[in-house]
């Protein structure tokens, strides 16, 4: 993929202009509402967001002390669907899946620390690494007393979810794989590489101009465009430099070399993938993904050749939004079959 300085100027200019629009529809008071709350929180969501995200998030103290917001919807049970998002999304990504499943299945959907409605500590106060993310999920599952979890993973949620699953295969039931990876790979889109640029350039793009979360609201769609409120929903938690700390952290945590701090963690996850061979799996893949393209889809087919797989050639990275009912219904049927 060729990428020129003109591309970067165009991209940054669009981001700068958008900062005055939907990208700056602020989180207004939500962070204050989460901090220090032990169970249900927050209450400060605006009406337009509650219409799309009609849930009452809960709050959990992670091992490093940062507060994690998470959804816990559906009947109380020690069996749950665990839905793990990636970057730059949050549990908002799973809103329609949760609404479909929650009448009969418990659904737990965390916002990773620094993302969504979770606390956003500085990089000095939280270790924004894959290992820390996995530890947070382990602690959340243990705190809820879950004895069996069915995984739904997307983007970074794949590495995090399979990190959990390969460490605790006895707890894992069915697995839904959505445009993700859980193994090292040297491929990286030029636009994401730009967001990792040294000398503070990458941070300026991601945190100063919202040049990762905002472009995703159009680059991650192909079949249709997100509505104005859907865009606002995705961007709601990331309204300023400080609130984009984890968006930048995830980009920098992509292990592109063996010397990277998270390479060993990801390689260990890859080695553990055979432990989950017998688990029923459903692969749902958007073929118009600028990041996790069909190379990754084919890798998953090689790793788990017995998995049920559906490829949607005209669907983008935000496969749940772009694929709509067609994708969501397949997830619902697959997971409800776990109930016998």
Model-derived features: where do they sit?
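Arg/Gly-rich low-complexity intrinsically disordered repeat tracts
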Residues: 2-12, 20-21
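Flexible "cap/lid" subdomain of the alpha/beta-hydrolase fold that forms the substrate-access gate
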Residues: 33-59, 66-68, 73-75, 80, ...
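Short amphipathic alpha-helix adjacent to the substrate-entry channel of hydrolases
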Residues: 93-107
